[in-house]
From Swiss-Prot:
One of its GO terms (molecular function) is zinc ion binding. It is found in: Cytoplasm. Binds 1 zinc ion per subunit. Gene3D superfamilies: Cysteine-tRNA ligase, C-terminal anti-codon recognition domain, HUPs. A motif ('KMSKS' region) lies at residues 264-268. It is an enzyme of class 6 (ligase). It comes from the Bacteria. PANTHER family: CYSTEINE--TRNA LIGASE, CYTOPLASMIC, CYSTEINYL-TRNA SYNTHETASE. This is Cysteine--tRNA ligase. It comes from Campylobacter curvus (strain 525.92). GO terms for cellular component: cytosol. ATP binds at residue 267. The keyword Nucleotide-binding applies. The gene is cysS. NCBIfam families: cysS.
């Protein structure tokens, strides 16, 4: 498999530290607000990577963290009067619900920073002991001047605009130096004094705790949004070099921005489009399809028109799924599977891979039109659809349930009552009443289909 390494700035062959195994760490959200589409893009992109590696036969260990102690969370506490736990638990639950809607696989481990304080403190202590951290009146700082390879990850330089992203403090030895531990009597005990961890000290310690390897690298792949490359990932890598005398990750992968009106989408810019808002207009899988249809490294401008176009492509997959309802899957068509995996093995070339999916859907429908009772064809189509679900994470729903999107629970209850009434009418051979109920449902924009599995319905 070929992946784009952000450090080498080119595609390279993925050769894991341990043959047949892949360790991946993805920077998760800071939980002070609902997830926006930028968070979703990152989660879905690297969920796709994980799925592809699994399909290729790798054993994957996947960790995604929660930053649940941070300046932004403290500001939210101040603004709302709520506790740290109230805020973080609310937004972790919100994020989890969004990820479930997007059919993102659960990480193997999803640590919170507050659960890893001992590991974080020990990591900072190691940096202090090695003489690469120093104390100021407001906290413990990392001395970037002690790391000869600082900037080697991002390829940046002493650009003033970039350095401005690092928290300022006139007493720092160098403007690039960053805080490891912030003194604050309200928080946690440590050998340095009461306080809380700095953002950059959290992820590197969690990687050490959950994914560490002997040898030259801690993990195979460190992933996240391209906006994290500097300073966050640069600072993580610097700490690992100085504390462990090794590289944090063998490969670094970054997804691109989602823009709104050609500006990067972010909470700080106030132009966030939340996942929960997008999910009001389309099913979660349609949003997922939209996000993976563009290459993970591409920056693209959010468009509702493109979102609906993505849903129409997904609709075709589900309409095909309905045509093989109740069919047991046979064997996936080898050439189709090979074409998809070949494209995805080229740095997740989803455009090419999804073109193969579109071609399969068309040819499958053509085949069923010619021979609708061909059991072998139906079994192969069902197997191909299962493969699509495993790899792309779409097509997992019941075919009819997918087309019930937008129907309220009250409406579903009314529809069920009418269908039950129709079933009873048919049992009593009162076919005129059954037809009347069908017409009544059609007037409600509900289409019904009698199948071996029972009467199914969908929103027209």
């Amino acid at each position: 498999m070929q992946i784009f390494d952000s450090v080498k700035k080119q595609k390279v062959a993925f050769e894991p530290i341990k043959s047949g195994k892949a360790s991946i760490y993805l920077c998760g959200p800071t939980v002070y607000d609902d997830a926006h589409l930028g968070h979703a893009k990152s989660a879905v992109s690297f969920d796709l990577l994980r799925r592809v590696l699994l399909e290729l036969g790798y054993e994957v260990k996947f960790v995604r963290n929660y930053t649940d102690i941070d300046d932004k969370i403290l500001k939210k506490m101040s603004d709302t009067g709520k506790s740290l736990e109230e805020i973080t638990q609310r937004y972790i639950a919100s994020y989890e619900a969004d990820m479930s809607a997007l059919n993102v696989m659960q990480p193997d481990i999803k640590p919170k920073a507050t659960q890893c304080l001992e590991a974080i403190i020990n990591y900072i202590q190691k940096l202090v002991d090695k003489g690469v951290a120093y104390e100021l009146k407001d906290g413990i700082y990392f001395d970037t001047g002690k790391d000869a390879r600082y900037f080697s990850l991002s390829g940046k330089d002493n650009n003033t605009d970039l350095i401005a992203r690092v928290q300022s403090n006139d007493e720092k030895r160098d403007e690039k130096d960053f805080v490891l531990w912030k003194f604050d009597d309200k928080w946690y005990e440590s050998p340095f004094g009461r306080g809380r961890p700095g953002w950059h000290s959290e992820c590197v310690a969690m990687i050490k705790q959950y994914l560490s390897n002997d040898g030259e690298y801690e993990i195979d792949i460190h992933a996240g949004g391209i906006d994290l490359l500097f300073p966050h990932h640069e600072n993580e890598a610097a700490q690992c070099r100085c504390a462990e005398h090794k590289k944090l990750a063998k490969y670094w992968m970054h997804n691109g921005f989602i823009k709104v009106n050609n500006e990067k989408m972010s909470k700080s810019l106030g132009n966030s489009f939340f996942v929960k808002d997008a999910l009001k207009s389309v099913p979660g899988e349609a949003l997922r399809f939209y996000l993976i249809a563009s290459h993970y490294r591409a920056h693209f401008n959010y468009s509702q028109e493109d979102l609906f176009a993505a849903k129409k492509r997904l609709d075709k997959i589900y309409r095909l799924k309905k045509r093989v309802l109740g069919v047991s899957a046979g064997t996936c068509e080898p050439n189709f599977k090979a074409s998809v995996l070949e494209a995805l093995s080229d740095d997740l070339n989803t455009s090419k891979a999804l073109a193969s999916v579109d071609e399969f859907v068309k040819s499958a429908n053509d085949g069923l039109d010619l021979d609708p009772k061909n059991k072998a064809l139906k079994a192969q189509i069902a197997a191909n659809l299962e493969f699509i679900t495993r790899v792309f994470g779409v097509g997992a729903m019941d075919g009819f349930e997918y087309f019930q999107f937008g129907v309220s629970d009250d409406e579903k209850a009314k529809i069920k009552a009418l269908l039950d009434e129709r079933t009873q009418a048919k049992k009593e051979r009162n076919f005129s009443k059954a037809d009347e109920i069908r017409k009544k449902l059609n007037a409600m924009d509900i289409a019904i289909m009698d199948t071996a599995q029972g009467t199914m319905w969908e929103k027209i």
